[in-house]
Amino acid sequence: MLIYRRISNFIKRYYKNTYKKFCVRFISTNLEWKPSIGLEIHAQISTESKLFSGGPTNFNHPVNSCVSLFDCAVPGTMPVLNKKCVEAGVLTALALSCEINAVSMFERKHYFYSDLPAGFQITQQRKPLAVNGKIKFNVFRPGLHKESYSKSSKIKQIQLEQDSGRSLHNEVLGRSLIDLNRAGIPLMEFVFEPDLTSGEEAAALVQELCLILQLLGTCSCKMQEGALRVDANVSISKPNAPLGIRTELKNIGSINALNHAIEYEIKRQISILQKGGQVINETRAWNPVNKNTILMREKEDKHDYRFMPEPNLPPLYLHIKRNVQNKYNLIDVPSLKEQLPELPEQIRKNLLQSLTPDTLAAVTSNCDLFLLFCNILKNGKHRDPQLMAKLFISEVLAVMEYHNLNLTFCVNNQKYIEELMDLIQAKVINRPTLRKLVHELVKKPNKMPKQIVEENKWFMISDEKELELICSEILKTNPELVKKYKAGKKRIYKKFLHKAAILTEDCADMVKVSEIMTRLLS
């Protein structure tokens, strides 16, 4: 035992010293160099039709089945602005504290890609929909006990633009195929100032933006479907010096990948500068297999996109004054502002009164989880937030992971999950029964929890007289264990509780069982 303790203490000291050395090295590197990260985010607007045509926006439809004549640039077709897209853009800009421009302009951005049939993209460059916004978010430092700090990032502008098609590369045939289903889908482009300093901050910003967009219903934020695409501009400089030469990171498929890609690029650039080299202005792609960034193309010259006003679209006028009559029936910004729901920052402030910081960090670690949790509380004002969060994370999600299911399954079966939570809060069932019920949900999704409990008689046994009889019987039939317990072997106590759980088929109120067992043994 003494040898074990010495080895254990040695291991603790070793890791403590290693951690200190690593921290000193990391802090000194960070003091010497200052990373600057700016994000450009494209979010597909959740509408049924495209930005300038009546073409549908369905993701899973067969290739080239959602293409209107305008989308494939048939000569003579004209753009017609989708009002719903403008309203979604204004609502998003208001949620991000932006200044809405009363007049914005559409322009043509010329470049040739095979999946851009017109040879130009209709966008907003010089006079966008909104400018000068800000997003606040919490950044959680990695570790067992997640500490957070507050951060904000400035939004330079939000602009509306149309998406391009997709190029599908067939290696077997040795050719590229074009799918124009995505061409013309409405986008909001968010251009952020380079005021972030790490991959963790960038990931936290995107996560917060996803929460806001999903709460507003303006974007699904499904990165796996391309509904949200993030590019990162990374540069390294000395503190208080001008920004260094930047590299642009693309091909980032998830929030986690964004964090890793930026952290890798920061280390790569620092390594180049420490060796006396020079960072090249280039576009790099994140390789998720090798966990590194690879060269896509060098940016030797600045592209001349030949921006020009879109001749087929008039300026976009909005009604922005509150107490002035809207004579021309323009999109009314003040009325849209009144439709804003409670935003994540305010929801977190409210939840902080009911949740511990660790639980709040766990609940807000995933966009889908946070939205589902908010909906569960919204549908039942009587529900205890701390209990709901703990049960959902420790019990429900554990069973989902066991069956290789994701949160979509919980979203689709939200009523079932809510009834489960209500049964346990009302002390109708206990936690082991909750686990059994979640397993039953996966096997038989048509039955509701209360019905299953009634059929199997899984009600929690909480009657003290009944529990005392069970505890007395256990002690009576196990005299040897009682003798060992009274002799000082306190670990045997768990065996008594285990036997009580077996006798009651995991339906006993184990808090009461523990109290009764302790009283009887003393």
Feature roles, as predicted:
Residues T359, L372, D384-F392, Y416, ...:
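Residue-level detector of well-ordered alpha-helical segments, enriched
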Residues L407-E418, V428-L503:
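Strongly charged, low-complexity linkers/loops
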Residues F26-E342, R348, S354-D358, N379-P385, ...:
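Basic, nucleic-acid-interacting segments
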Residues S46, K267, I393-E401, H439-K443, ...:
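Amphipathic alpha-helical core segments of compact helical bundles
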Residues M1-E32:
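N-terminal mitochondrial targeting presequence
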Residues K490-S522:
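Short, amphipathic C-terminal "tail helix"
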